[in-house]
């Protein structure tokens, strides 16, 4: 028989003819529902049913004060604060950092019946002592800090006065008023028998009310305690019950009811450590899968960490219905991601490109925005490399027919009007999203539920903003939204009388199950651990007997062990994973269970690692089909670049992805100059500077003419690449200066060459070339194409120069073993240089020796780094017909492999 069944049995035995006078008072609605069920099962004759209410409803009834919800309370408090504050009050955004904490403290002060005339001066005196030094005068900040503590009591009294006027209150306010109004309630309810069920930790107000009712008009309180904990003076699970049985006047003449001995009965306790939360979910799913259907009806799955609810539900495939009774954080829902993205977007005057793309990529908007609208905006931003974009430009990027929906996301408003519009538009978005929810979807009911919760939130926010107008910026709105969401949850309410019961720790109060599964039994979750979420110093709380972390730990201890009391089989899962900040420490409750050594308890502790199957990595190969060969023919006709050929040498599979499938990394907006753009700007600047002097012998005067043009030329090239970005700040400005240094150093290098007597004639700059590769055994014509950075004659010798903004070593442009030219990527730069040499000889139809070289801007002091090889063990820098004949022979072999249908593309390791 469960605890609640035993309560009903005992009450019916003691009050068989007074049933209609009974009022059952419980910790919440769920125990009340089970009490009703057991009452109906045990009463065998027709009778007027007793009343079942929660303790909060009883206090509301006694006090005559209606509860006020958190948001209106916060706004009322700020209103009282601004009218009471003697100095310049904090902005609403600043107030949010301490306002909710103060309200929580006010409620606790009232619940524990602490005299406000004493506690606030006490806190102020302590704070004053902290700042006292005896000599130094207080700073303005210290004075303001002390003024706050001196005024905290004024804020409390102002709020209390306002709430009294409204007839509404927070929890502690209602409890205090209930104590004040209790004598009248007792006078008018002498015929009522109150039955208090399932309580443990009680505030002073609750203790006073319950004791007074029991002693003055009669009734019972049924504890759910166990002698094992009560008789152990150091065990936290019995902390409150020991305290009440020893200190209540009621127990001077009465014995505590329902202190039983269930915990030491036979139990199986399985304590399982599992790495990562997701593996806990899978372990639970496996456990439930192997559980008979009938046993599931007597099983409770308790989710200690609410963030694990969805992973567990996704992993579980139950044989019976699943009924969830717990809260799920609204901030974990997909709809929250949409509104976070929505508000973040409007934090600055211009729209940041990442915020736009983040908003437009939200799954919920896919049903409201046409796919091409998202694509067009994304393409416009990336094509124009826009870091920030104005509303006007954004709307110009799409068709006018799509402006109406975009107006919801990007409203044309400013100041407080923008705040109102954003809230209104959020409500409109919810309406439109609700209309698009697919009723056939497995999740449509859940989606509707959290859409409604967001609607409630924004609707209430709209009313409060209209009434008070305290939110004066998008930043305040955004932070307020985040603050509210952090404390908001979606409350699931299932059918609690049948099926597998899934619940949180608090929802399990007063309920009993034969089999219990609890997840996340880790320190910081169960128990929660120390929390500094209070303005009241610990010493003050301790002296005035307010709740501290010690009492909170005792609450967690009771709740945990109460779940275990009547269970026959218990499965506790904890996370063993270590992250970068801290290890996931097993809960102290698990350590206690391991240390207890109770003979009737079978304790099995295990660490369960997920099965890992070693991956067998086989090199990926792609067979060539006729379609692939057709695509290669198109490529051959358009022209293959030297860099594409080196890509094949590096990894044929990458060549296939890029040149056949045309899979490249998606173009992104560059907020800071990337390597490709860096190179483009350097190349473009040198092209602009040298173009006026093509086919002329460079002189010192030419270089001197270029020098004052360096800065404006770089600026022009930057502006072409970054049309909307101010490159004169941050990293881009540093990179701008690096490019300027490179270009000026290059001109200085050229000037030194000229001064030393080198005759330089620039012939081509950034020259585009497309030529056929001539070889007798190719299956079809193949063209090479590319851009040669610079072609000079230096002292009459043709020089082909390939700029490199990275580092180039001499070994990179050297060939020792020609057999590795088309197989080893270390010859990649040398292969590219030879390809440029081959292309220029065909393009100019020449047959002369030449120098082909890299020029590394990071190693300008080394000058040109020319290709060289070895013939008859002699180093040779000249690229001649002999050199190019060797190159052609190996390159033909490479091309035959690329275009051979029988040679697959393969992945190089």
Placement of each model-derived feature along the sequence:
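RecB-family 4Fe-4S metal-dependent nuclease core
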Residues: 438, 517, 580, 619-909
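Conserved helicase NTPase motor core
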Residues: 127-128, 132-239, 273, 514-515, ...
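Basic/charged alpha-beta structural segments of nucleotide/phosphate-handling enzymes
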Residues: 29-189, 204, 381
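Accessory/regulatory regions of helicases
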Residues: 337, 350, 354-358, 522-639, ...
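Conserved helicase core region in the C-terminal RecA-like lobe
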Residues: 54, 193-202, 300, 305, ...
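Accessory helical subdomains and C-terminal extensions of nucleic-acid helicases
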Residues: 83-115, 191, 314-322, 354-453, ...
């Amino acid at each position: 028989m469960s605890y609640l069944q035993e309560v009903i049995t005992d009450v019916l035995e003691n009050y068989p003819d007074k049933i209609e006078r009974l009022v059952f008072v419980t910790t919440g609605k769920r125990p009340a529902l089970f009490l009703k069920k057991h009452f109906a099962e045990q009463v065998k004759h027709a009778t007027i049913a007793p009343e079942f209410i929660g303790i909060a409803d009883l206090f509301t009834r006694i006090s005559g004060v209606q509860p006020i919800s958190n948001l209106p309370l916060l706004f009322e408090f700020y209103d009282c604060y601004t009218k009471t504050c003697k100095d310049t009050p904090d902005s609403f955004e600043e107030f949010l950092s301490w306002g909710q904490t103060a309200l929580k403290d006010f409620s606790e002060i009232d619940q524990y019946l602490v005299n406000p005339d004493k506690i606030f001066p006490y806190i102020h005196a302590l704070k004053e002592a902290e700042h006292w030094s005896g000599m130094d005068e207080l700073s303005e900040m210290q004075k303001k800090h002390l003024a706050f503590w001196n005024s905290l009591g004024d804020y409390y009294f102002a709020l209390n006065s306002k709430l009294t006027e409204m007839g509404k209150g927070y929890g502690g306010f209602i409890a205090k008023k209930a104590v004040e109004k209790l004598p009248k309630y007792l006078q008018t309810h002498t015929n009522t028998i109150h039955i208090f069920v399932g309580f443990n930790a009680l505030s002073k107000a609750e203790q006073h009310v319950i004791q007074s009712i029991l002693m003055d008009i009669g009734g019972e309180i049924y504890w759910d305690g166990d002698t094992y904990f009560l008789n152990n003076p150091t065990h936290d699970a019995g902390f409150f019950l020991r305290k009440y049985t020893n200190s209540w006047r009621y127990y001077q003449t009465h014995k505590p009811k329902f202190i039983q001995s269930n915990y030491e009965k036979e139990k199986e306790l399985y304590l399982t450590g599992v790495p990562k939360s997701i593996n806990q979910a899978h372990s639970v799913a496996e456990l439930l899968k192997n559980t008979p259907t009938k046993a599931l009806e007597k099983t409770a799955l308790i989710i200690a960490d609410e963030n694990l609810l969805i992973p567990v539900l996704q992993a579980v495939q139950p044989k019976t219905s699943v009924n969830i009774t717990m809260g799920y954080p609204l901030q974990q829902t997909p709809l929250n991601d949409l509104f976070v993205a929505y508000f973040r977007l409007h934090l600055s005057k211009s729209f940041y490109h990442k915020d736009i793309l983040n908003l437009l990529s939200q799954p919920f908007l896919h049903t409201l925005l046409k796919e091409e609208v998202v694509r067009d905006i994304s393409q416009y931003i990336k094509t124009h490399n826009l870091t920030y974009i104005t509303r006007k430009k954004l709307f110009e990027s799409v068709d006018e027919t799509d402006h109406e929906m975009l107006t919801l996301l990007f409203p044309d408003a400013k100041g407080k009007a923008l705040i109102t519009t954003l809230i209104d538009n959020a409500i409109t978005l919810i309406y439109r999203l609700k209309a698009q929810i697919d009723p056939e979807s497995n999740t449509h009911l859940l989606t509707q539920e959290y859409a409604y919760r967001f609607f409630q939130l924004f609707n209430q926010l709209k009313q409060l903003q209209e009434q008070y107008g305290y939110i004066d910026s998008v930043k305040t709105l955004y932070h307020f939204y985040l603050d509210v969401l952090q404390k908001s949850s979606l409350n699931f309410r299932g059918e609690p009388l049948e099926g597998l019961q899934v619940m949180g720790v608090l929802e399990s109060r007063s309920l009993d199950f034969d089999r219990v599964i609890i997840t996340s039994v880790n320190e910081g979750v169960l128990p929660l651990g120390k929390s500094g979420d209070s303005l009241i110093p610990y010493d003050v709380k301790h002296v005035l007997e307010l709740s501290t972390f010690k009492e909170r730990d005792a609450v967690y201890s009771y709740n945990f062990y109460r779940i275990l009391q009547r269970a026959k089989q218990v499965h506790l899962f904890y996370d063993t994973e270590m992250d970068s900040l801290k290890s996931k420490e097993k809960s102290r409750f698990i350590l206690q269970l391991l240390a207890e050594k109770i003979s009737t308890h079978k304790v099995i502790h295990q660490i369960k690692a997920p099965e890992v199957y070693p991956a067998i990595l086989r090199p990926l190969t792609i067979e060539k089909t006729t379609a692939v060969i057709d695509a290669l023919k198109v490529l051959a006709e358009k022209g293959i670049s030297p860099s594409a050929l080196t890509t094949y040498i590096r990894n044929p599979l990458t060549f296939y992805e890029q040149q056949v499938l045309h899979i490249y990394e998606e173009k992104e907006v560059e907020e800071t100059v990337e390597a490709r753009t860096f190179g483009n700007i350097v190349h473009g600047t040198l092209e602009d500077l040298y173009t006026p002097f093509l086919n002329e012998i460079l002189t010192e005067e030419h270089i001197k003419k270029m020098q004052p043009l360096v800065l404006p030329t770089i600026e022009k090239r930057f502006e072409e690449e970054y049309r909307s970005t101010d490159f004169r700040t941050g990293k881009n400005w540093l990179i701008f200066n690096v490019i300027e240094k490179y270009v000026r150093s290059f001109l200085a290098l050229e000037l030194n060459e000229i001064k030393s007597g080198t005759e330089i004639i620039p012939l081509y700059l950034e020259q585009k070339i497309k030529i056929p590769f001539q070889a007798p055994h190719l299956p079809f014509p193949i063209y090479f194409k590319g851009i040669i950075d610079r072609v000079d004659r230096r002292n009459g010798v043709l020089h082909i120069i390939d700029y490199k903004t990275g580092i180039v070593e001499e070994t990179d442009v050297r060939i020792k073993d020609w057999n590795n030219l088309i197989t080893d990527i270390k010859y990649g730069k040398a292969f590219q240089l030879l390809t440029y040499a081959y292309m220029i000889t065909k393009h100019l139809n020449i047959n002369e020796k030449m120098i082909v070289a890299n020029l590394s801007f990071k190693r300008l002091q080394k000058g040109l780094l020319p290709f060289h090889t070895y013939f008859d063990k002699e180093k040779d820098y000249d690229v001649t017909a002999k050199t190019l004949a060797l190159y052609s022979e190996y390159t033909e072999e490479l091309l035959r492999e690329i275009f051979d249908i029988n040679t697959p593309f393969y992945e190089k390791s």
